[in-house]
Regions:
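Ubiquitin-like/PB1-type beta-grasp interaction modules and other compact soluble beta-rich domains
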Residues: 1-91
């Protein structure tokens, strides 16, 4: 099934603005992120901790609705879903 991935800020520099990913039925948010990390070591280094878990500061949205990166990674994805990936936001 096809899902769209949109990347922002430093993740955009690594992955590009957006990409369509063909993933197996039943894939979860985490399995998609790991798939992206497998093909992009720079993304994996930025998004995942040394122990392999997603860094808690990574912001995720599915279909423009924010999800909790610590508790919602097992959400199954559906055909046509859009996953947005944001790095931490800082400012002053």
């Amino acid at each position: 099934m096809l899902v769209k991935v949109r990347a922002f800020a430093q993740f955009r520099e690594i992955l590009g603005k957006e990409m369509d990913m063909n993933i197996p039925e039943g894939s979860t948010v985490l399995s998609l992120l790991k798939s992206i990390g497998a093909s992009s070591p720079a993304f994996r280094e930025q998004a995942f901790s040394g122990s392999g878990g997603l860094n808690d500061y990574v912001l995720l949205m599915i279909n423009k609705k924010r999800i909790d990166p610590l508790n919602d990674l097992s959400i199954p994805l559906n055909e046509g879903d859009e996953l947005a990936i944001f790095p931490p936001v800082a400012g002053g």
